[in-house]
Amino acid sequence: MQAIQDEIKQLTDELNQHNYRYYVDDAPSIPDAEYDRLMRRLQELEAEHPELALADSPTQRVGGEALSKFNQVTHLKPMLSLDNVFSEEEFNAFYKRVGDKLPDTPAFCCEPKLDGLAVSILYRDGVFERAATRGDGTVGEDITENVRTIKSVPLRLRGSGFPPLLEVRGEVFMPKAAFEAVNDKARAKGEKLFVNPRNAAAGSLRQLDSKITASRSLAFYAYALGVVEPETWPLAASHFEQLVQLKEWGCPVSSEVKVCADIPSVLAYYQDILTRRSELAYEIDGVVLKVNDIAQQQTLGFVAKAPRWATAYKFPAQEEITQLEGVDFQVGRTGAVTPVARLQPVFVGGVTVSNATLHNADEIARLGVMIGDSVIIRRAGDVIPQVVAVVPEKRPSDAQAIQFPPQCPVCGSDVERVEGEAVARCTGGLVCEAQRKEAIKHFASRKALDIDGMGDKVVEQLIDKELVASPADLFKLTASAITMLDRMGMKSATNLVNALEAAKQTTFARFLYSLGIREVGEATAANLANYFKTLEHLKQADAETFMKVDDVGVIVAQHLVHFFEQPHNLEVIDGLLQAGVHWPDIEEVAEEALSLKGQTWVLTGTLTQLNRNDAKAKLQALGAKVAGSVSKNTDCLVAGEAAGSKLTKAQELGVKVIDEAELLAILGS
């Protein structure tokens, strides 16, 4: 038995070494026939002695039992997206922004921007443990079994020196040859074809049956380290050197990665990759540029959803000429009225395009486009088709001007366009069918009226079954009507009716927030409530008065004026008040009672005696501004249980930190 165990280990190690030479070094070390012979021998031994199979055996890539659904995974560290630049001018502006914040001129690590899907792969003690999609950057889907089938993903890291916990981030993609093979097979079976390699990779990676994923010849390139534990683990000081380290540990890295010391060399790299784009074995849509020095990256930091130290320099999208046959006006869930060009179908960038966005009235005027024109279509970012130019010499004599509608094409409400904004919007947010679902979901949400049990799916069913058309209709619902919904028995329906009754007791700030007024978030709603004290005073205000409120500028003031000018909005508000929605009066607070006025506070961790929203509201009532992140301008951090990175940053910056007990004492609870 020991001899068999030794042979299994020898075959596993030998095959993994050949995989490394093939997928990472791009230098096959044996003929395919010899590789196949070794693989068959290992499969025979493992079939006879399954208990001896090793976790990193290459036979484990064939796929396992099909899943019923993907589980969600919360990333240990957010997977942020990248900002884009589309021209040399925009790149120069990015370079200047970066250079202005650093004492030394930065070098950039440059690499092709793969047109695939970002994934996170965790290794614990060098062994593949979990893989997840990027998702929304915070929460992704567990695709462990599917990624396990990708031959270029090491199931065990090579060598030594890797940390006990290592997150490898990279891109899963489908090489062009594999894409053609998949489509050839689908074509032979009369099945639907994938339109491009990215869609094929996405469809393959999100298969519930990993055997299908295994058959699709996906590939993986690592592009960054993610979480490393312990955090003190010694790592290379540059991004390029970290990629070299990943390659030494067995993770494939693009052979096109290069460090560029200055603007000319970055631009030359961009042009070189653009020129060779069609020659590469995989689809790309630009190049990624990252400040190479890790210390400089840390100095630059992040904005809300992207690092300041990196950008994607996108390639020009593919373009074609076709005829604009008409324009439809679509109303989005936030009320944005968008002109959409109806086109004579044309094949652009791998897909047939029959519609393209015209964005807004300003863009129509800038283009000078008319119905009947021949137009140039571009797939912006290789995804969203748009009209980018008119071919004036082809304009027909019967071309017609495009008229922007003064009323919403869905509900007939006025269409407004606030000065300084490009987007025109329907003002019927509370009654417009196009916005109805989002308006009522917002109204019922936790930070608004907080209607327990009124989730998104319940709202969608209520509207689809025409039980509710506006927020006021929610309070007319009966338990018997609610039982018409899927999976809603009498007990659940009664609970929801009781929750609706309880939600009638709210606060003025929550009520204002629940109305979904454009640009009026939770903090602005609280400021409005504290300033005006009553709904009647607020409804009578003009733009000048609104602008006296903290955080209310010209645009928000105009949104408020337009909202309260619309009769249908006032009708919905009256309906809510008649249904019994109410709130306690807001008492005048003396200036000296605003003990925290001018201070910025941050909450982190779990509060056990006070929920987060109540704590925030009480701090705001004392004049504090409650922010979402810690900075040098933070006056105090409230650290609840399991406080994380915010606490660490506060301690590093010397920000005052208190616990929940101290907060309760300050609030007088």
From Swiss-Prot:
EC number: 6.5.1.2
Pfam families: BRCT, DNA_ligase_aden, DNA_ligase_OB, DNA_ligase_ZBD, HHH_2, HHH_5, Nlig-Ia
Top EC group: ligase
Binding site for NAD(+): 32-36, 81-82, 111, 134, 171, 290, 314
List of residues binding Zn(2+): 408, 411, 426, 432
PROSITE patterns: BRCT, DNA_LIGASE_N1, DNA_LIGASE_N2
Cofactor: Mg(2+); Mn(2+)
UniProt KW keywords: DNA damage, DNA repair, DNA replication, Ligase, Magnesium, Manganese, Metal-binding, NAD, Zinc
CDD domains associated with the record: BRCT_DNA_ligase_like, LIGANc
Domain (BRCT): residue spans on this chain: 591-669
Catalyzed reactions per annotation: NAD(+) + (deoxyribonucleotide)n-3'-hydroxyl + 5'-phospho-(deoxyribonucleotide)m = (deoxyribonucleotide)n+m + AMP + beta-nicotinamide D-nucleotide
Matches recorded under Gene3D superfamilies: 5' to 3' exonuclease, C-terminal subdomain (1.10.150.20), 6.20.10.30, BRCT domain (3.40.50.10190), DNA ligase/mRNA capping enzyme (3.30.470.30), Helix hairpin bin (1.10.287.610), Nucleic acid-binding proteins (2.40.50.140)
Single GO BP term: DNA repair
GO molecular function terms noted in the UniProt entry: DNA ligase (NAD+) activity; metal ion binding
GO cellular component labels: cytosol
Active site as annotated: 113
Task performed by this protein: DNA ligase that catalyzes the formation of phosphodiester linkages between 5'-phosphoryl and 3'-hydroxyl groups in double-stranded DNA using NAD as a coenzyme and as the energy source for the reaction. It is essential for DNA replication and repair of damaged DNA.
Family under the similarity heading: Belongs to the NAD-dependent DNA ligase family. LigA subfamily.
HAMAP family hit by this protein: DNA_ligase_A
Name under which the protein is recorded: DNA ligase
Protein's organism: Shewanella loihica (strain ATCC BAA-1088 / PV-4)
